[in-house]
Amino acid sequence: VNGEKIKVISEAFRDEVVELRHQFHKHPETAWKEVETTRKIESLLREWGFEHIRRGVRGTSCGVVADLNPGREGPSIALRADMDALAIKEENSVPYVSECEGVMHACGHDSHMAILLGAARVLSSIKDDLPGRVRLIFQPAEEGGSTSENYPGAECMIREGVLEGIDAIAGLHIWSPLETGLVAVRPGAFMSACDSWTVRIYGKGGHGAMPQDAIDPTLAATTFVNLLQTIVSREVDPKEIAILSVGKIITGSAFNIIPDSVEVTGTTRTFNPAIQDNMPVMIQRIADGVCAALRCRAELEYTRFVPPTINDEELTKQFIETAKGIIGEERVQISPLIMVSEDFSYFQEKIPGVFFFLGCGNPAKGTDNPHHSPRFNVDDDALSTGVELLAGFAAEFLAGKR
């Protein structure tokens, strides 16, 4: 498939892709509530002639899967975009500001959907030239994987067969720390695993002026928090990477009361599965040791949320070569390891996958604010690059596997 042809077609849909992103941005929906977003995407795909469109996952009306050339012999590739917004009140002053109070697309998923829809338009325009099949995956609840009350959308879609008959998968994330139009990717380990934990420390409540009659769980909790960092500094090989952070401590009801219990909640980030497996063992041991010394009792609740994002080596090399051909060698970078997490990793546990960052940072346009901040925004000039990369890589993959 001619790369220049893809570029020309992408350019023709440039304004439409930008408008789609603005519409998604105005009407954000949080994890497992992406009903209207799903309806809009499904309607567009039917209008553009896609077949075998399936809507909904996990008994909801959220998420869309659609196939291009479903009956064609040959290789197959899936392209994925996440859909959900965040419970954040937007502080941007743009014509397409969120119209949903307290909810905004603060991580760029509006861009991901618009880019994948743009790639869908391009690929449907050249479908007769494609020697294989393309599956589009619009996934709900990527952010949903970060809370114990929710489920990662990727994992749910896999359970319902979204990868059946698919040889490989590709996805992207818009990235404000990276200059608009640049691409960053990394073969092998790319983004960390994400786990959550809560330690509850139980003592015996009492009067703050009579500590001898109480068993102080706050003292145990503060000692526990301090000693936690010895896991990273003294138990994890210095050549490995691990993060252990405390995000929340809940205790007490008044200034003069020693509480009965303290709840400490945090996250771990790892790349090495052996270290990830050992984290709850190490946390529990420190909690038990501290509590034994200070007459308290500890309980650990440990939840493994998202595995590390591991890019397939060969597929990533192929993507890098394709990207260099589309946007130029100087605009493709090898990324450092990234400590945030992404449930695209569930797909990569099943089939070869490549995930990359697309830069959208432009200080002149105010699009260099951090992800998950109320002033996060995307430079629309990045969108057409994303369309070309997804469509171009899908076409190159199918041609190379023929």
Predicted regions and their residues:
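Active-site beta-loop-alpha junctions enriched in small/polar residues
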Residues: 29, 82-84, 141-143, 175, ...
